[in-house]
């Protein structure tokens, strides 16, 4: 998903990939929230599509419970040439990289990565319904776990006394 929870559909990703490759530019997909995008109810993109259309992408780990890191996937052989040595020479390779790998091996065993992602979306949809039942709208409609309700500033002030939350932006004079 994007920063506001919307997703790219297959046709959009294909068009972006086409333009990038036509212009000789590699396409990188930031996969920090990849599981949530791929498990969204209206998603039509598969992991295989991403691997086919992108030159480099990563599979985010921390947002689905990993202690740290992302798994970088390089599908373009030109980019992958000597990649391992470049990151090692620049201090980007962990001496004990297997610790990172074990997390992803575990996350992808028995579909755990997808289960965690689906569960997060299901919980976000419950929150969304509760906000809607109270008459609140959302910054943007989406089907991922990133639900951004727009609330009256007075309500936010009351919430700030009891809860921690992130402020996105003001949507008008009295709502955020």
Regions found by a protein language model. Give the residues of each.
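Active-site C-terminal subdomain of aminotransferase-like
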Residues: 1-8, 40, 44-146
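General beta-strand structural signal in soluble alpha/beta enzymes
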Residues: 27-31, 57-60, 140, 167-169
């Amino acid at each position: 998903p994007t920063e506001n929870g919307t997703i790219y559909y297959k046709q959009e990703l294909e068009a972006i990939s086409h333009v990038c490759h036509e212009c000789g530019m590699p396409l990188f997909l930031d996969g920090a929230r990849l599981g949530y995008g791929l498990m969204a109810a209206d998603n039509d993109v598969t992991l295989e599509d991403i691997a086919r259309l992108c030159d480099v992408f990563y599979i985010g780990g921390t947002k689905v419970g990993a202690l740290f890191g992302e798994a970088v996937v390089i599908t373009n052989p030109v980019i992958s040439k000597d990649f391992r040595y470049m990151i090692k020479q620049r201090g980007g390779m962990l001496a004990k990289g297997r610790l990172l790998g074990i997390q992803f091996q575990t996350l992808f065993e028995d579909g755990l990565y997808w289960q965690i992602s689906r569960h997060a979306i299901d919980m976000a949809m419950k929150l969304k319904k509760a906000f809607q039942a109270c008459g609140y709208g959302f910054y943007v409609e989406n089907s991922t776990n990133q639900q951004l309700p727009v609330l009256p500033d007075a309500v936010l002030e009351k919430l700030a006394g009891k809860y921690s939350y992130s402020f996105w932006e003001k949507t008008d004079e009295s709502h955020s």
